[in-house]
Design a protein with these regions (language model features):
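Active-site rim helix/loop that mediates acceptor-substrate recognition in acyltransferases
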Residues: 11-33
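Conserved beta-hairpin
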Residues: 30-48
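Conserved acyl-donor/pantetheine-binding loop and adjacent beta-alpha core of acyl/acetyltransferases
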Residues: 44-107
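Conserved GNAT acetyl-CoA-binding A-motif
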Residues: 100-101, 128-141
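Conserved beta-strand-loop-alpha-helix junction that forms the acyl-donor binding cleft
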Residues: 104-113, 137-147, 163-164, 174
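Conserved active-site alpha-helix within GNAT-family acetyltransferase domains
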Residues: 119, 131-133, 142-159, 163
């Protein structure tokens, strides 16, 4: 992101990273997890609700993107880099069996950047987390993006290192109240 080191460095080429992102978007679309802020496609957001299952067949576009854009050696290197960071917030919450809303993708096309669409997109996820009474979580690989998420109300939950320069920042936004389930139990 703007010259910052990040997970893009784990990919052998920018085209492999682009293929991965396209595969992820196709998977999100097939699972009904892709949302937009408006008619013009000002911002796109992919999030997974607690308990939402990923259909097996929908993983094929992502797998095809990975295997089609990298050699076996490059795939092994990519897997090695990705495993260095250790368990993130998502894995910790899974282990503790705590529900959460996971934001896997947030994209604001260049013509719409700096116009508040990132906030609008995130507010969709925050509102859904609020409605369900669960935290919204995401991870990002650039310090400047992390700072934007912090400005939008998220909290830094942890940092993972991938090699000498690359990091992943785990962020969380807790709901203001316990949601529908919390209200029923009172």
């Amino acid at each position: 992101y703007k010259g910052e080191p990040g997970l893009i460095d784990a990919f052998p080429r920018r085209s492999a990273a682009a293929a991965f992102i396209c595969g992820y978007v196709r998977m999100a679309l097939q699972n009904g997890m892709l949302y937009t802020t408006g008619q013009q496609g000002e911002a796109y957001l992919a999030y997974k609700l607690p308990g939402q299952k990923i259909r097996f067949r929908s993983v094929f576009p992502l797998a095809k993107a990975l295997f089609g854009s990298m050699t076996l050696k490059e795939l092994l290197r990519f897997a090695s880099v990705m495993s260095r960071g250790g368990a993130g917030l998502r894995q910790q919450l899974d282990r503790e069996r705590k529900p959460y809303l996971y934001v896997g993708l947030l994209c604001v096309p260049e013509p719409y950047q700096g116009k508040g669409y990132m906030r609008k997109a995130l507010e969709l996820a925050f509102a859904e987390g609020e409605r369900l009474g669960v935290p919204a979580i995401l991870d990002t690989d650039a310090r400047s993006k992390c700072e934007k998420y912090l400005h939008l109300g998220m909290q830094l939950a942890g940092t993972r290192r991938f090699g000498s320069h690359s990091r992943l920042y785990d962020l969380i936004k807790y709901p203001a109240f316990a949601g529908e389930k919390g209200r029923e139990s009172k």
